Design a protein with these regions (language model features):
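Typically disulfide-stabilized, N-glycosylated extracellular/lumenal ectodomains of secreted
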Residues: 126-143
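Beta-strand elements of modular eukaryotic interaction domains
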Residues: 6-10, 30-32, 59-62, 114-116, ...
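Surface-exposed ligand-recognition segments of extracellular binding domains, strongest
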Residues: 64, 68-130
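Extracytoplasmic/secreted cell-surface and envelope-processing proteins
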Residues: 52-53, 79-82, 135-136
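Extracellular disulfide-stabilized recognition modules
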Residues: 1-39
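Conserved hydrophobic ligand-interaction patch in extracellular adhesion modules
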Residues: 25-75
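Cys/His-rich zinc-coordinating "finger/knuckle" motifs
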Residues: 18, 24, 41, 87, ...
Length: 143
């Protein structure tokens, strides 16, 4: 089955590429689709990568309505939500057994709504992007 229409592609000088596909689906479906195409859901190590990803997603969105894009942000059933941490106890799920950064800059701790407090349920989060008043876009993680 062919992939959904690709909305945008952006590659870094270091060789990593991000692509956004517009489709309605669950976290598991998005992760599986990325795996089929030898990729993985995006993860962000710092502000430069975040700016790159936000630019790509802004290019992919159409209209002022908020859009939610699945990224590799997940909380295992054995981890607790932690309001003191930027990612609130969530961590980056990396395709192919790679490792994501453990230290996360505070600037990445922007949530549209605080995630549900839990120590027993696996949870997933995406990156929500919305048109901001006066131009530009607002963003935040959202369960």
């Amino acid at each position: 089955r062919p992939p959904p229409p690709r909305a945008a592609v952006l590659c870094q000088a270091a060789g990593a590429c991000f692509s956004a596909y517009l489709a309605n689906g669950s976290y598991a479906e998005a992760s599986s689709a990325c795996s089929r195409w030898r990729g993985g859901l995006a993860w962000v190590s710092g502000e430069p990568e975040l700016r790159l990803l936000l630019g790509l997603l802004a290019e992919a969105t159409a209209g002022p309505a908020p859009s939610l894009f699945w990224v590799g942000l997940k909380k295992s059933a054995f981890a607790c939500t932690d309001a003191e941490q930027p990612l609130r106890g969530f961590s980056w799920e990396v395709a192919g057994g790679g490792t994501a950064p453990r230290e996360v800059p505070a600037a990445l701790g922007r949530w549209v709504k605080e995630p549900l407090r839990s120590c027993v349920t696996a949870r997933c989060a995406g990156l929500q992007l919305a048109a901001a008043p006066g131009g530009g876009h607002s963003w935040g993680w959202k369960e």
